[in-house]
Amino acid sequence: MQIGQLQHKGIRTESAAASFYLDTSITGYSDIGKPVSITDDFTVGFGADGAEIIGYLESYEDRITETVKMGGVNWHMCAEFTYTGTDPTAGSHVVADGAGNVKLAGAGAGLNTLVCAVDTTNKVVSIIFR
């Protein structure tokens, strides 16, 4: 596989991670661990406000020679993210807030996430992806 021809053929769901191009919302190593959404073909970023989260950024690589930024995204796991806005509750769902955090999902959204615990003091939510 060459850079510029990224494919996900053959990746089994048990792998729980895959490589993606990174959009301009992701700027460096400090974004590792933040929730990401699909923003274009084979591309992830922080997504628009309310976008479905597919996982978290597991790695960051600036391939200067190829002029692309790439990262690994993990999606089969438990994670803790900072949230904004209304406090989620256990059993609710979250979506992207467009700035590298999550927020309480509206009706019918964020169904691939399940809130397990909420720390309202530190604005941190524990979720599992399903």
Regions found by a protein language model. Give the residues of each.
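Surface-exposed, low-hydrophobicity beta-strand/loop segments enriched in small/polar/acidic residues
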Residues: M1-R130
